[in-house]
Amino acid sequence: MTDRVGLLLGLDLTEVGRVAEVLERHGERFLARVFREGEIRRSRRHPRAFAEHVAGRFAAKEAAMKALGTGWRAVAFRDIEIGRDPSGKPLIAFHGRALDRSRALGVLSAEVTITHTRDLAAAVVALVVPA
């Protein structure tokens, strides 16, 4: 007999131009409020596409909040960490209240995919949970 599972999905689309404006106006303060140190360090490795990279990770965090069913008031942006495996595949990790919520939902695994152009960044988060 196969164990049944469910899928919780979150999708977000972010305008790169809006992220670029926020970075220009609030710079380090915005980065520190939304991203963990490792995320900031990894984004800085892409100086020509910095805004696109940041927008993609921002979209992934928003998609994760939607998949968790919380919105940004119940979970801090920094409670969701977007990384990469050695091959470059995006990874997602939960901390703090996001980790608490994922445990309450019984999340078995989490997947994230990110794409961006010069204008738009999009991300989908899929959480596998018991049915």
What are the residue ranges of the model-derived segments?
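Core catalytic alpha/beta fold that binds nucleotide/phospho-ligands
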Residues: 1-131
